[in-house]
Amino acid sequence: MNKRWFALLGCLLFCASLAAPAQNLDAVLTSMDRAAASFHSVQTDFNADMYQKVVNEHDYQKGTMYFRKQGDSIEMAANITDPDKKYVVFSNGVVSYYQPSINQVTEYNAGKNRAEVESYLVLGLGGGGHALTNSYDVQYAGMEQVQGVSAAKLALTPKSQRVHNMFQTITLWIDPARGVPVQQRFDEPSGDYRITKYSDIRINQKLPNDAFKLKTDSHTKVVKPNG
């Protein structure tokens, strides 16, 4: 899948020892399973650091993200407030990227990749724990302090070569008390990476009525690169 998907979804878009006790990993995955069983929605603030190795540059973003799961339907929205206002919405298999500065919406249809895109959206958040082992080799890498939370660090290595070509490793820092991530890191083979920290996480609370609607007007231009 084109990396552009994940650059957008990431806006959105919330390995140490092989000898670590197996029950620790199982306990973390079980807490994630419990959280997924009752998961309907989440609102969270985020801070993201996107690093490009070839130019040795960091791109920082912050804002608020929203997730909603109804049956098999998944929606996500990211309101980026800094450094520039931008908005991303994933709904009905379509990623819509709104740039108010040029009053333009760019739409990408996930098409046959919809299920895969949705699986990344709920990675560690509403997607369950033990289900991760179907697609990843999962290692428990101990506990680390992340924004005042003692979080369980899980290192995921994709089993699929195609996914591994995009992400060498994916690391999740899980709050074991709530079974949700407080930090995620996606490492690409090129040396590029994205780290996202989540704070003020509100689970299953009422979301704004317009959380998944772009605030466009009659003059907004819509571009569809892949039809």
Language-model segment annotations:
Residues 9-17:
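Bacterial N-terminal signal peptides
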Residues 26-27, 129-139, 196:
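A short, amphipathic edge element
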Residues 97-124:
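Acidic/charged, solvent-exposed loop-and-adjacent secondary-structure segments enriched in E/D, K/R, S/T
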